[in-house]
């Protein structure tokens, strides 16, 4: 979350983004939308969901780190919200989120040190991927590049098959 806030604050500082109210929700080990998250989705214009999958089990139905992002995207879509999924680690999880209206691959999950707060000029090391993905999401940076791997489709049980999705 800190790296996302940093990226947004940097965009505001650079006059690439204005008039934004940011609300966040950190999910960990929960697979369903609670009332707090539901209210946040309902009151938002745009939904950005970050996913972090480090192994094939995280792509299967029943895995909290797959189910909650999917549920958030589904609920946002039901309310006609713009939804974006940011894949933070391995891009294979994109196949699990074909319900998102847009997908961004950050290809790096190392965020900022949370002890630095929301500063524009961090002094501790951090990964550039998450802040840069905020630039892509908000249109300040044009996405470029090609994934170095194919993203296969998923079977209903969350296992990968040989059909290339992306």
Each model region followed by its residue ranges:
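C-terminal non-catalytic regions of proteins with extracellular/luminal or membrane-system context
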Residues: 1-166
């Amino acid at each position: 979350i800190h790296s996302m806030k940093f990226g947004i604050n940097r965009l505001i500082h650079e006059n690439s983004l204005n008039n934004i109210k940011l609300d966040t929700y950190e999910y960990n080990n929960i697979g369903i939308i609670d009332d707090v998250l539901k209210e946040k989705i309902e009151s938002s214009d745009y939904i950005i969901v970050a996913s972090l999958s480090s192994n094939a089990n995280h792509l299967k139905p029943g895995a909290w780190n797959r189910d909650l992002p999917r549920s958030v995207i589904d609920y946002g879509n039901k309310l006609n919200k713009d939804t974006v999924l940011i894949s933070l680690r391995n891009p294979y999880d994109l196949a699990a989120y074909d319900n998102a209206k847009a997908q961004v691959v950050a290809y790096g999950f190392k965020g900022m040190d949370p002890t630095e707060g929301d500063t524009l000029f961090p002094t501790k090391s951090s990964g550039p991927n998450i802040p840069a993905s905020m630039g892509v999401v908000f249109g300040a940076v044009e996405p470029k590049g090609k994934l170095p791997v194919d993203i296969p489709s998923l079977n209903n049980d969350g296992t990968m098959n040989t059909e290339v999705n992306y």
